[in-house]
Amino acid sequence: NREGMSYKIMRVAVFFDLPTNTKAERKAAAQFRKFLLDDGFDMLQYSVYTRLCPNRDVAEKHMMRVKRHAPNSGSVRLLYLTEHQFTHMHVIVGEKTVQEKNVPAGQLAFF
């Protein structure tokens, strides 16, 4: 029981650009993507993954996991967004992902 823990829904967004020139680099990139999926992230775009979290504490826990599993080369960035900010994203070309369409704003999805 954590008293005082707030429940402001957050999104953790991970953006990455990883080298894939060698077999080892391709393997590292694939392992990182698999880690993100296994850790509950959904692919928003090919190198952009997001995860819904009930609050900032949980978001920070997942940020630390991303840091531990990130490859040693390339570029990996992480951004915290409130659910309000995320739902106001404009899709200029293309359309929302199936996950975005199926989970209404502010509703956590548990699988």
Regions found by a protein language model. Give the residues of each.
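Basic nucleic-acid-binding interfaces
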Residues: 2-13, 18-111
